């Protein structure tokens, strides 16, 4: 069974936490992680690109010259695609790039990235993140006490963490999520994970 050190908010060690190997100790599947990251990045795309076809371009209502007798090619509109200033053919339309992978694939990817963080020593467990009011300075002290210098993803329990979330949202390189909302993309993008002990339990309940 994998074990990680358990810390208090002040940075002192409070013991160890034993992790479920079926969640935090598997052999990472990099191919599945890649597929899920691509899927989640695709879901973030706005998809608001658009073009104007010949019916949407302004003007062009009048036939430019009569059908016969001019010696020129017949034309019905100055906004046909072959004209300068004409409509675009087969251009982009607004659409969603999102697509959904099977649940088991997404869960395997989560297990893989969690296991990688544990194996690399980049998962930090903390017994609690308890704040009596939303104070950015107080959360900054926690980050400093735990010697976290680079980008960190803070994983909170699913409920009852409003002050902790508000305290962290104005800090650079700190992103906050919950046990049920943590995504593969967020975890991969972070250098370290700071996970509350109760959130670890909730993660294991879902993924084990």
From Swiss-Prot:
Question: Which is a Pfam family this sequence falls into?
Answer: Ribosomal_L4
Q: Which PANTHER family match?
A: 50S RIBOSOMAL PROTEIN L4, LARGE RIBOSOMAL SUBUNIT PROTEIN UL4M
Q: What is this protein called?
A: Large ribosomal subunit protein uL4
Under the heading HAMAP family, the entry gives:
Ribosomal_uL4_B
Top-rank taxon of the source lineage equals Bacteria
- List, alphabetically, the Gene3D superfamilies matched: 3.40.1370.10
Q: What are the alphabetically sorted keywords of the record?
A: Ribonucleoprotein, Ribosomal protein, RNA-binding, rRNA-binding
């Amino acid at each position: 069974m994998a074990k990680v050190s358990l810390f208090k908010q002040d940075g002192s060690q409070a013991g160890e936490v034993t992790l479920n190997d079926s969640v935090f100790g598997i052999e990472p599947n990099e191919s599945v992680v890649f597929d899920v990251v691509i899927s989640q990045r695709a879901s973030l795309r706005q998809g608001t690109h658009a073009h104007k076809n010949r019916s949407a371009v302004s003007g062009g209502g009048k036939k430019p010259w009569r059908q016969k007798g001019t010696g020129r090619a017949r034309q019905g509109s100055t906004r046909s695609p072959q004209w300068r200033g004409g409509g675009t053919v087969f251009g982009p339309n607004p659409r969603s790039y999102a697509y959904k992978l099977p649940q088991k694939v997404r869960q395997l990817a989560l297990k893989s990235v969690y296991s990688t963080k544990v194996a690399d020593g980049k998962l930090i467990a903390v017994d609690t993140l308890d704040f009596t009011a939303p104070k950015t300075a107080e959360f900054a002290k926690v980050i400093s006490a735990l010697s976290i210098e680079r980008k960190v993803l803070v994983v909170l329990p699913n409920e009852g963490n409003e002050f902790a979330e508000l305290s962290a949202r104005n800090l650079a390189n700190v992103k906050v999520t919950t046990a049920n909302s943590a995504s593969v993309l967020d975890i991969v993008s972070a250098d370290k994970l700071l996970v509350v002990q109760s959130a670890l339990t909730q993660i294991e309940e879902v993924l084990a």
